Amino acid sequence: MSSRRKRAPPMKVDEERQQQLHWNMHEDLRSEPLTMTVGEQACSDADSSSDCIIIDEGPPESALHRDKKRRSETVSVLEATEEETRLSVTLNVTVSPYRVDNSWKAFLGDFALQLLPKESLVEHFSERTFTLSPSESSSQFLIYVHSECKNVEKQENVLEGSAGVCSKGIRVESSFSSDMLQDLAWLQKRRGIKLYQRPDGTHTIKVGIYILEAGLTRLDFMSDAGSRMKKFNQLMKRVMEKLHNFIIPDVLEEEEEGSESEPEGQDIDELYHFVKQTHQQETRSVQVDVQHPALIPVLRPYQREAVNWMLQQEQFRSAPPADNSLHFLWREIVTPDGLKLYYNPYTGCIIRDFPHAGPQLLGGILADEMGLGKTVEVLALILTHTRQDVKQDALTLPEGKVVNYFIPTHCPREKVKNREIQDTEYEPKEKVHCPPTRVMILTAVKEMNGKKGVSILSIYKYVSSIFRYDVQRNRGLLKRMLKCLIFEGLVKQIKGHGFSGTFTLGKNYKEDVFDKTKKQAVGSPRKIEKELRKSVNKDADSEYLPSNTSDDDEPYYYYCKAGKSRSKLKKPALLTKKGKGQSVHLDSQGDAPAAGVCASTDVHVSENTCVSEDKQTQEAKDCAESPNPAAEELAQSNTSSPCETSDYRFECICGEFDQIGHKPRVQCLKCHLWQHAKCVNYEEKNLKVKPFYCPHCLVAMEPVSTRATLIISPSSICHQWVDEINRHVRSSSLRVLVYQGVKKHGFLQPHFLAEQDIVIITYDVLRSELNYVNIPHSNSEDGRRLRNQKRYMAIPSPLVAVEWWRICLDEAQMVECPTVKAAEMAQRLSGINRWCISGTPVQRGLEDLFGLVVFLGIEPYCVKHWWIRLLYHPYCKKNPQHLYSFIAKIMWRSAKKDVIDQIQIPPQTEEMHWLHFSPVERHFYHRQHEVCCQDAIVKLRKISDWALKLSSLDRRTVSSILYPLLRLRQACCHPQAVRGEFLPLQKSTMTMEELLTSLQKKCGTECEEAHRQLVCALNGLAGIHIIKGEYALAAELYREVLRSSEEHKGKLKTDSLQRLHATHNLMELLGAKHPGIPPTLRDGRLEEEAKQLREHYMSKCNTEVAEAQQALQPVQQSIRELQRKIHSNSPWWLNVIHRAMEFSVDEELVQRVRNEISSNYKQQTDKLSMSEKFRDCRGLQFLLTTQMEELHKFQKLVREAVKKLEKPPSREVIESATVCHLRPARLPLNCCVFCKADELFTEYESKLFFNTVKGQTAIFEEMIEDEEGLVDDRVPTTTRGLWAVSETERSMKAILSFARSHRFDVEYVDEGSVSMDLFEAWKKEYKLLHEYWMTLRNRVSAVDELAMATERLRVRHPKEPKPNPPVHHIIEPHEVEQNRIKLVNDKAVATSQLQKKLGQLLYLTNLEKSQDKTSGGINPEPCPICARQLGKQWAVLTCGHCFCNECTSIIIEQYSVGSHRSSIKCAICRQTTSHKEVSYVFTSEKANQEDDIPVKGSHSTKVEAVVRTLMKIQLRDPGAKALVFSTWQDVLDIISKALTDNNMEFTQISRIKTFQENLSAFKYDPHINILLLPLHTGSNGLTIIEATHVLLVEPILNPAHELQAIGRVHRIGQTKPTIVHRFLIKATIEERMQAMLKTAERSHTSSSGKHSEASVLTVAGLADLFTKENEELE
């Protein structure tokens, strides 16, 4: 059941609401509404305004006939299709006379009903309602006139067959067809329109069609597609087409949004060519000289054209258009009655309000090809077109307002800055002035007074923290003053004796304070000060008297009660000094301090009731005009502090508390919240110039206008923008800020951002800023929905508080998906001009442009519905004109080929490096290919249509079916790059020798697995033969098992339990002396072998038991030593609790324990926390006593239970464990000694640890309900969970911490420390004790496993009950033959697999020998057929025998066998090997090596080729720089280690933090000539013209990424020829991929260059990649 509670009892719905909640399931199929019951009346009162048209079921008939007809029509409606429904359902329309009422309606048009000859109308026809029904003739209709009725509402709901309807119909002809009338009826039923009579001639009846207010559409915005049901809009479109001749030009019928299919081959170049032609033909409205004086480079002609077009897009030097144009989607219609309505012909929506056109596009897409200088074009635009109409309203201080700013007065102003920076540094203890001790004690007692009073420790703490009084030094003084106050009756003791009790205010407190307050109110300032000085001197206390000139002056604090009003005085009233005289301003109500207003402090002060308002004003003026600086400073320092007012609220973004620190504070002008000025980046010099608003108020206000341009770029090229600006723009021309987010800068004031010319931000920062948008204000309702008040204010993003002049998305293809966080945040920014800058705006397809259009905010195409319907859907239907024309308006594109004569870039060439695998790599690749091919085909078969492109599938499916391809591509680079195959790369890079060793180990493991399967099948077959009485055959199979294990003894490990099974059962067969079993020499040693196998198996368990016991003893010894250190009779924590109660600090202790338990505590829903079980020290004492007793109890029980299990297990223990949990019938019974001990462990664990995981009992209780039986017959090893600190231990720690902080007896603290050490020792003991229990349990389990290992297959006895659940070794008599056939098949498969794997192992072993460098890679063994030396090339069959390549080719060509002649037989052992399983060894690969350039280290073929190529580049052209691109970072790490081995200096870009540093080192350091770049981050936007070589380690499926990578060097500024190097492995998936990409490029050059792998590949193409390569391998 849901945990949500009902908020209110159920209530009965009124009748009107009930009618609204009724509906008909088939109403969309029918043309008439539901008929009403016959019992309803026909008419009543005449003043209704309900619907004026109803639909009846037909002419008047008898009730019986009508009921039968209704039932038959209902059946026909249910069975009819949508087309049949329109023809079969009877049309009935009721038209009412027109009456003026208060409801809104508009006349759309009318249709005519023409009377036939010999037909006439009844009297007063125009005032009566009639029903229009069809007649026998399809072109004629019948009118049934209703009787007169006073109530229009009842008249309109009149029913067929009622007495109020005429029985004779009047024949008419309609100007509307029957279909159109049905549409009107459906619309009327939905309360969208009404039909009324209109006056006309006697032979013609005019019926007016009126649209009602309910028929109008409510839109959220003008481009909204509408939320009304689709059928309503379709019918309205038909009506408007009929009445107003609205026909949608050049737009196809709307279809489902997902129905369009992507066109075959999107020609992106065709779009770019159209854009280019359009711009060449248009005339420029703006032609200016864009060569700004501050711009250093001279713009090329194509760049000038681009900047001029951008200026035109931003309406440079042109007046903005009037904002009164009609929206593109809407048409204005004037109804016959003169009303103006607006109609959307695309949706059928009608509205009343004028649909204003959306804001005109300012900006666009700058899509110049990579390397043509888009950055310079943007800088020229920024310099040329600056904002002129910047509104400074939000940046200027409102007239009559001041910014409240103050520095806490207890901090000297000259030390504020130092303390802001170094609050924690040691400083000399400054002199602190405090009020009299009398005042401090009374304040403490009053403020902290509770039900039980205030203890003296609480008074000490309050005085120390609030007044900064040295309590340690003056404790005796405070005690003496407290005695005096008790004697005077100002304080009384309500509990305890002496100073250990609690205190509260006495009965004389009010009268005393009232008298003093009265005297002060009427006295002069000097007299008051004099009295206060006397009062101070009377106390035996440190005197408090402020100096006249010091900045350290503290104001006098005095507490007063005005009259008998019990108003709380939470803050002390303030005595301030002004000029030469002193004046006291005391608030008579005691609510807040009052003081004169000083203009120099800019602080609001409460109204003063003791001094007149005029006097305050005059004093403030005197203070402001005072010529003496010292007096001004004195007045400022002594003005009432804002923190002493009742409405003072402090909440800063730094998280510091109000009382901490001495930083200056500033108040928001809007929400009046105080914050640290430095934290919100507000400077004191701006007090009289700029207003201050807190971050939340700034974000909620109108954005601040600015001239700044916001540039959003990838992290990799953020610093490149700064470099480009510094290089291309003259110094001091632009102010540039690199914004790194609120995490780095805090909240920057919008006026600071507005002062910049360019603000640069990365997409990563923009993405993170989304988390700081829409944060609720601390003052709002959403901001206070927390149990405790927030410690700090969440910082909103200042980016949304600025109206940017220009927003530029660099490499805008990163936000083409409008759902990504960066795109979502970019859309939230407010800007005038919006620009998308990208050299490849289209990567997957033309649908990518939609994300850019959404950012630009171009209506209506920024709505997905209109983008698809008006642009993309026609494009898919071979009508690209609409899309091309729209894109041409917003995009500028220059291609390199069009401006090649202007940029003068040297040519770029390409080199292909075809490589061949080494034998070890080839073997590894074949293994991977076999697994990946099977995996891929299995996944692809789940997809029915193989013609689908991968881009049409969901992301998860694409990732799944591309995973096998990914593994093969990685295997071509380096075996260690394949995830999950080897250890992580952080350990070390694997050499080829290590790869060979790893492959040998894997192959050995596979051989052992195949051998285990073979032995299992042989043992099973032997059991079947014993069942059938074939004892000789059974004995032979058991002997075959023993022979096989001996035969492979040096190569493979045979399972000892399988050998024991064969030995034991063979010994039993021989002991039974069955006839026909021949003896062998080994029979006499079977018993001894069986004994050795058992002892060897048990020795491992016995060793584990001894080791666990040995590990446990030191911990138990340390526990005994710790227990000896605890001497007291009562527990130390109990003594601490008692002392806390004696000193009346028990409440503090309880609170500290609760806080300790609650911190980092995740409470379970069904469990009560310990902190909720006690309220005072008595409850805490009871809980701890109970829990410690339970802990010691279960600790003792667990130790005793384990002690009992130490002795060797008896037969009874083994049998009980077997029945209980080792081999239970269904569920574990938990009845043996081990299970009972485990339950004790579970209980002990719950006491010792804080464990939230279910124990064993709960787990098995849940498994009882499992119908399929026991899921796992093993007992869980432990309870399995979180070993966190228990609540008992945390309580003890809190008590110990309390005792230390209050300096209780050292004895208690020492015992507490020992107790905590004891807890740690107990936890160690528990873990070791549980491991010891596990080893003891495993020892019993091993004994049972030995017993189970000797059991063989047998038939269930006739009277033996059928086991439930079934047992594997007991079978039914009819299952014997089935098991025999299965085991025979298993034996054949295992034998074949074992031979294959042994052959591979032999092949790898021979390969290891052939790679011995001492032999030069030559195999000296002769070929078994021709006797020639095998040399450097030979073939290995699956059996492991080797032949020369010539003999192998002859065997394959002439002696192939099997189906399709696809196998050969070994010339030595005659074992069959398929052609594809023949392994070829090549110890000398000439294609991969160049003898003149040796490479150090053992690397993969491709890594070695990359390193050799880099070395060759350096030899041919010293100082030439090269970029190395790879899709995977792991491959780059492997290459980096290979470069290190060969002493080649390089740098690598793998982390954003070191990106700029490493890139600069590559560019400017002459010794670093190699840069390793990951493709996904290093290929976008970077300018690295210093490099001339680009190395692509693997073929790239996304050619757009490839173009980006190549474009890093082939761009403006490049002065040298560039070379692209590609590395491909022959006869692998890479060769197939390269051929596929070349084919796609030739068939459609441009479009294939912009697609991702998901767009390039189809399902069939992916399958073809695997199948074709499989054929090549064969």
From Swiss-Prot:
It catalyses: S-ubiquitinyl-[E2 ubiquitin-conjugating enzyme]-L-cysteine + [acceptor protein]-L-lysine = [E2 ubiquitin-conjugating enzyme]-L-cysteine + N(6)-ubiquitinyl-[acceptor protein]-L-lysine. ATP binds at residues 368-375. One of its GO terms (cellular component) is nucleus. One of its GO terms (biological process) is nucleosome assembly. PROSITE patterns: H15, HELICASE_ATP_BIND_1, HELICASE_CTER, ZF_PHD_1, ZF_RING_2. SMART domains: DEXDc, H15, HELICc, PHD. Keywords: ATP-binding, DNA damage, DNA repair, Helicase, Hydrolase, Metal-binding, Nucleotide-binding, Phosphoprotein, Transferase, Ubl conjugation pathway, Zinc, Zinc-finger. Pathway: Protein modification; protein ubiquitination. Residues 302-384, 701-859 form the Helicase ATP-binding domain. Residues 1-26, 524-548 are annotated as: Disordered. InterPro entries: ATP-helicase/E3_Ub-Ligase (IPR052583), Helicase_ATP-bd (IPR014001), Helicase_C-like (IPR001650), Histone_H1/H5_H15 (IPR005818), P-loop_NTPase (IPR027417), SHPRH_helical_1st (IPR048686), SHPRH_helical_2nd (IPR048695), SNF2-like_sf (IPR038718). GO terms for molecular function: ATP binding; DNA binding; helicase activity; hydrolase activity; ubiquitin protein ligase binding; ubiquitin-protein transferase activity; zinc ion binding. Pfam families: Helicase_C, Linker_histone, SHPRH_helical-1st, SHPRH_helical-2nd, SNF2-rel_dom. The keyword RNA-binding does not apply. SUPFAM superfamilies: FYVE/PHD zinc finger, P-loop containing nucleoside triphosphate hydrolases, RING/U-box, Winged helix' DNA-binding domain. Residues 12-26, 526-541 have a biased composition (Basic and acidic residues). CDD domains: DEXQc_SHPRH, H15, PHD_SHPRH, RING-HC_SHPRH-like, SF2_C_SNF. Broadly expressed (at protein level). Residues 433-507 form the H15 domain. Belongs to the SNF2/RAD54 helicase family. E3 ubiquitin-protein ligase involved in DNA repair. Upon genotoxic stress, accepts ubiquitin from the UBE2N-UBE2V2 E2 complex and transfers it to 'Lys-164' of PCNA which had been monoubiquitinated by UBE2A/B-RAD18, promoting the formation of non-canonical poly-ubiquitin chains linked through 'Lys-63'. Homodimer. Interacts with HLTF, PCNA, UBE2N and RAD18. This is E3 ubiquitin-protein ligase SHPRH.
